[in-house]
Every structure is written in structure tokens, then in C-alpha cells.
């Protein structure tokens, strides 16, 4: 590592180091970590978070079974509060949790190879257990709400047990969801009960609220699992850059020094949450948010209401709070980062610190840009300086930096505008067809059902994001698309798709989306032999519910393109028009299946001729 980079690296992380030293000093004051976490969270919250932790590791265990493990840990915590010098009180809390899991009787009978994790030493033991977590598993049913005529009475008679069952159910179904989020959802559910139990139709009231809560839980779970995936795959520095951009956009009035401290603190908390250390995750998240609330005048006036909420509700509220308005008098960055003759001297003297401040300054001026776009802009600017600062006339070399950076902006703006215009002008059905055509051509190896699922996710993103104002549309679109792409790349690791996908997935984090957008037809793909059975037509095309008919037609479209990914838009239209005419004709006949048998055979012959596919 260059000395310059090392020195600037130390400078950049000095605030984080001081914070970490403070944390170690704080922990050193407590001989027992479990005791001080228990004291911080108090009994009810500690119990709830312990239940979340066990439910996320042991997803098949019953509530009663996990309650015994929670009791063991709470008993130990209370013992350690009374006497921190007790021998078993000095262990790290995550080790205490995993030791408890490894003492479960017949662990292997229920969890098979997961039991082998117990033979490993920490932290490998925890990594092993994490690898066995199953997101939204088939063997776990969604939360089953008690009947409307008894739910209010059950809640009133035994609130703690009632909410405990809710927390348990959500945690085991969402094993990567952070504890603060789960407790926030439990509070939302409790508020819904308190409101709906006053209504004449309790069930209808709860149904409406539950739909919103389920969608919210699913969305937050997907995002948090994605954050953990980014941390694991790309490491601290990429995640740090993401956080710096996001927090600079959200709190543009806060000085760089304070935003940097918050970034470093948040990385530590996210790592705890991603590692399954939910008690530490909850405690340190609460402390971080309390620190933020104590500096509202520095960060934002938008979090005032959140900071007045109980600690269990505060974290999620702050995360969902609106961006603060950027200061009106921010000067242009051109003078400092392009026109200044000393740019190279500043860049070379403290590379990381210089780039971090550039990212902060650029981000706080552009809350309308996506995180990924700003990362591409920063990388483009950094690469330009690395090249230009080696020349005899650096200023002349980087004089057109603004134009080069604008290319990144235009590419992203054009992608968003093109897709939102398509959705607006033609509607969701045609938008989905367009997505399926594009991505089947890019990835014809992907199973039909998975392509349809991916297309639906992208259509949902379009519907959600394109209705937003220009100030949020890009960030919303590319943010969610990056999650879909990350999921595709994760699948690519275990089930390779093709060389183009592999190449895009190996790109820098911020370049993945443009790579997927620019990806062309997979020319190496060899279609399977034409099988007429894949294009069977029957009376369901007439009688099935509209949604089912639409799904069937989309699958036919995907399977058709898989036969020849190079087909043109004109060829697709010709075949689609033929299909529509066939359905219109046959659905009016008395013997529908006979008609489909004859007309379907003709359509297949015509389609093969259109595509130039031999017999």
C-alpha cells in the first residue's frame, strides 16, 4: 500500500477508530457483556430480542421450545447483573447464544448438517449457522392471526405472550430482518389492535392494516438482506461509500465530520445485525439513534417526531424519515474540484480523504441521483485524476471533467425516462412484455417461471417509482433494480447462466446495472430442438380468469423467444397478431378445442416459417 494512501486511510478512519475505542472502553467498564446489554435494553426488550435471535437461527422450533432457550439466557443475564465476576458471565453474548443452540437436544434430527456447525470455533461457527438460514421458508407459515372474535380478548388478557408469538412468527419467516425492524412491526401491530378493537368489524379493520404491514415487512426484509449481501460480497469500503452517499443526501446540512462519524457507526451496527447478533444490533442501533436525536440541530429537523417516540419505534421511524432540504447557498463544485490548480496536490496528499469529501459534497447537492450513479461519477472523477495528475498539464487534462461525468448522468436519466415513458404510454401489460422480451434475449437459459418472476418484479419497480417526482424517481428505480440484479447474480454463483451475466456480475458494484442494461442477445446460446408440445392451446385460453390467461400468454412469449433470441420486434408482432386472431376466432366456436387443434397447428407452422426454424 502506498504511504500516501495509508496515511490518508488512517486520517479518514480516525473518527471511526476513536468511536470504536470508546465502545471498547465502555464494554471494559462492564466485565460482562450480557449484563450490560440486559441493563441497556431492560427485561421485556431483552427477552423479545433474544426470541428474535433464536427464532432466526432455529426456524423449525416451536414457540414453547424457544421460550425455554430465552429463559436460560435471561436467567444468565440476571445472574450476571447481580455478579459480573461469575465465570460464565465473561463470554461474548453471541457465543452464549450459539452455545445455547448447540445444547438443544436432537438438534441433528431437526436440522441435519447444521448441527455440524457446533464443532467449529467462533466466528466460523456463526458463519456456518448463518449459511443455513432460509429466507421466507416454505416450512414456515405466515403469521396466522387469531379469529376476530377472540383476538382482542387474547391481547388484553396476556399482552406479552400475544406479542411474543407475533414476534416469533415474523422472525422465523424473515431470518435476515433486523431486530429493531421486527420490534417496530410488533408495535405497529399493537397499535392496529388498539385501534381496531374499538371498531364494530374488528376483522375488516385488521385486514386492511395487515395488508399494509405485510408489504412493509417484506420490503424492509428484502432491503436489509440486500444490505447484508453487499457487505459480505463487496466489503466495508463499498458499503461505507453507499452509506456516505445516502446519509449525505438525507442530511445535507450536517457537516462532513458528523456525517462521517455516523457512517462509521452505522457500518458497525449493520455488521452486528447481518451477523445475527440481534441483541447487540438492537442495543447499538438504539444508542446510535439516541446520539442522532441528541444532535437534531446538526442533522435534520425532519426527525423531530421520530425522536419523541419510544426507543423501540425510533430507529425504523428515522430510517423512513424524509430527506432534509439541502442548503440554498451551496457553491458550485467546479471551482474546487476542477478549476482549482491545486487539485492534484490535494488528491495525492490525501487520496481517500479527498475522495470522501468529494462524495459528501456531490451527494448533498444531488439527492435526486441514485446512490449507484454517484458512485459511478466518483469513480469516473477518481480515474480521471489518477490519469491527469501524471501528465505535464493536469488542468488541461481534466478541464472537460464535467462533460465526462455528465455522460454517466445522461445514461441513467435516459434509462429511467425511456422505461417510465413506456410504462406511462402503454400500461403495465405491455411494459411487462417489453421487459420479458429484453431479458429472455439476454438470459434465455433462465427457467421460464423465473424470467416471469423477474419481469414482474421489474414491472412493480416501474409502477412504484415512475409515479414519483423527478427528485426521487431515479434513486427509487436504480435502487430497487440493483436489488433484483444482486439476486440474479447470487443465483448465478450456484447456477451459472451465461458468460454475459457472469461478466456483469463480476463488475464493480455500481456498474452492474448499466452492464445489464447494455447486455445484448446471448449469441452463444444454442436453442433446444423445437417442441410443439411447449405451445399447446386449449379452452383455458378462453375460460380461465384474466390473470391466469395473461400468465399463460407471457409464458408462451418467453418460450417462443427462447427458440430464437435473435428474433426481431416485427417477427414477434407477426406471431403475436396471429395468436390473438386464433384466440378471437376459436373462443367463438362451439367446439373450442378442435378449433385450437387446427388453428394452433397452422400458427406453429406459420411461426416457424416467420422465424426460419426448420422442421
UniProtKB/Swiss-Prot annotation:
One GO biological process term: cellular response to starvation
Residues given in the record as Ca(2+) 1 binding sites: 33, 272, 277, 280
Matches recorded under PROSITE patterns: ALBUMIN_1 (PS00212), ALBUMIN_2 (PS51438)
Tissue: Plasma.
Domain Albumin: 22-214, 215-407, 408-605
Signal peptide range in chain numbering: 1-18
Entry's Gene Ontology molecular function annotations: DNA binding; fatty acid binding; metal ion binding; pyridoxal phosphate binding; small molecule binding; toxic substance binding
SUPFAM superfamilies linked: Serum albumin-like
A single GO cellular-component term on record: yolk
Residues annotated as glycosylated: 500
Residue ranges listed under propeptide: 19-23
CDD domains given in the database record: ALBUMIN (cd00015)
Record: residues binding Cu cation: 30
Residues annotated to bind Zn(2+): 277
Protein name (record): Albumin
Gene that produces this protein: ALB
Amino acid at each position: 500500500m502506498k504511504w500516501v494512501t495509508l496515511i490518508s486511510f488512517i486520517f479518514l478512519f480516525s473518527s471511526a477508530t476513536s468511536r470504536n475505542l470508546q465502545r471498547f472502553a465502555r464494554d471494559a467498564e462492564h466485565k460482562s457483556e450480557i449484563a450490560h446489554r440486559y441493563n441497556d435494553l431492560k427485561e421485556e426488550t431483552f427477552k423479545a430480542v433474544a426470541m428474535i435471535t433464536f427464532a432466526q437461527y432455529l426456524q423449525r422450533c416451536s414457540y414453547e421450545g424457544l421460550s425455554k432457550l430465552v429463559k436460560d439466557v435471561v436467567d444468565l443475564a440476571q445472574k450476571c447483573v447481580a455478579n459480573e465476576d461469575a465465570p460464565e458471565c465473561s463470554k461474548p453474548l453471541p457465543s452464549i447464544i450459539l452455545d445455547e443452540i448447540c445444547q438443544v437436544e436432537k438438534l441433528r434430527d431437526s436440522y441435519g448438517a447444521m448441527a455440524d456447525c457446533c464443532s467449529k470455533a467462533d466466528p466460523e461457527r456463526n458463519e456456518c449457522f448463518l449459511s443455513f438460514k432460509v429466507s421466507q421458508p416454505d416450512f414456515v407459515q405466515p403469521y396466522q392471526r387469531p379469529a376476530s372474535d377472540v383476538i382482542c380478548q387474547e391481547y388484553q388478557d396476556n399482552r406479552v405472550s400475544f406479542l411474543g408469538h407475533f414476534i416469533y412468527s415474523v422472525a422465523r419467516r424473515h431470518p435476515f430482518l433486523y431486530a429493531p425492524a421486527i420490534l417496530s412491526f410488533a408495535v405497529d401491530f399493537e397499535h392496529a389492535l388498539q385501534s381496531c378493537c374499538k371498531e364494530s368489524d374488528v376483522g375488516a379493520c385488521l385486514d386492511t392494516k395487515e395488508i399494509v404491514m405485510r408489504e412493509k415487512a417484506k420490503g424492509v426484509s428484502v432491503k436489509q438482506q440486500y444490505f447484508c449481501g453487499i457487505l459480505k460480497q463487496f466489503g466495508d469500503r463499498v458499503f461505507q461509500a453507499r452509506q456516505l452517499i445516502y446519509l449525505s443526501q438525507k442530511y445535507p446540512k450536517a457537516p462532513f465530520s458528523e456525517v462521517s462519524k455516523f457512517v462509521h457507526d452505522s457500518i458497525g451496527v449493520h455488521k452486528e445485525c447481518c451477523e445475527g447478533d440481534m441483541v447487540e444490533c438492537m442495543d447499538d442501533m438504539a444508542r446510535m439513534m439516541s446520539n442522532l436525536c441528541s444532535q437534531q440541530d446538526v442533522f435534520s429537523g425532519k426527525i423531530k417526531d421520530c425522536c419523541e417516540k419510544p426507543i423501540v419505534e425510533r430507529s425504523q421511524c428515522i430510517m423512513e424519515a424524509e430527506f432534509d432540504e439541502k442548503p440554498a447557498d451551496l457553491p458550485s463544485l467546479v471551482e474546487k474540484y476542477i478549476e482549482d490548480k491545486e487539485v492534484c496536490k490535494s488528491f495525492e496528499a490525501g487520496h481517500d480523504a479527498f475522495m470522501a469529501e468529494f462524495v459528501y459534497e456531490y451527494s448533498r447537492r444531488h439527492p435526486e441521483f441514485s446512490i449507484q450513479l454517484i458512485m459511478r461519477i466518483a469513480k469516473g472523477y477518481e480515474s480521471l485524476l489518477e490519469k491527469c495528475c501524471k501528465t505535464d498539464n493536469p488542468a488541461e487534462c481534466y478541464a472537460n471533467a464535467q462533460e465526462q461525468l455528465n455522460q454517466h448522468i445522461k445514461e441513467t436519466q435516459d434509462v429511467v425516462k425511456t422505461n417510465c415513458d413506456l410504462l406511462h404510454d402503454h400500461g403495465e401489460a405491455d411494459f411487462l412484455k417489453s421487459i420479458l422480451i429484453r431479458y429472455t434475449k439476454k438470459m434465455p437459459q433462465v427457467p421460464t417461471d423465473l424470467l416471469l418472476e423477474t419481469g414482474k418484479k421489474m414491472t412493480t419497480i416501474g409502477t412504484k417509482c415512475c409515479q414519483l417526482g423527478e427528485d426521487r424517481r431515479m434513486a427509487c428505480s436504480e435502487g430497487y433494480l440493483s436489488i433484483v440484479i444482486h439476486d440474479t447474480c447470487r443465483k448465478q454463483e450456484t447456477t451459472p447462466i451465461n458468460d454475459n451475466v457472469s461478466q456483469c456480475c463480476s463488475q464493480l458494484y455500481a456498474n452492474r446495472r448499466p452492464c445489464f442494461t447494455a447486455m445484448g442477445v446471448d449469441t452463444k446460446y444454442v436453442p433446444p430442438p423445437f417442441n410443439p408440445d411447449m405451445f399447446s392451446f386449449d379452452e383455458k385460453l378462453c375460460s380461465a380468469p384474466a390473470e391466469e390467461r395473461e400468465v399463460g400468454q407471457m409464458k408462451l412469449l418467453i418460450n417462443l423467444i427462447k427458440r430464437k433470441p435473435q428474433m426481431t420486434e416485427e417477427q414477434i408482432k407477426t406471431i403475436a397478431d396471429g395468436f390473438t386472431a386464433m384466440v378471437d376466432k376459436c373462443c367463438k366456436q362451439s367446439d373450442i378445442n378442435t378449433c385450437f387443434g387446427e388453428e394452433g397447428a397452422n400458427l406453429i407452422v406459420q411461426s416457424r416459417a416467420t422465424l426460419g426454424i426448420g422442421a
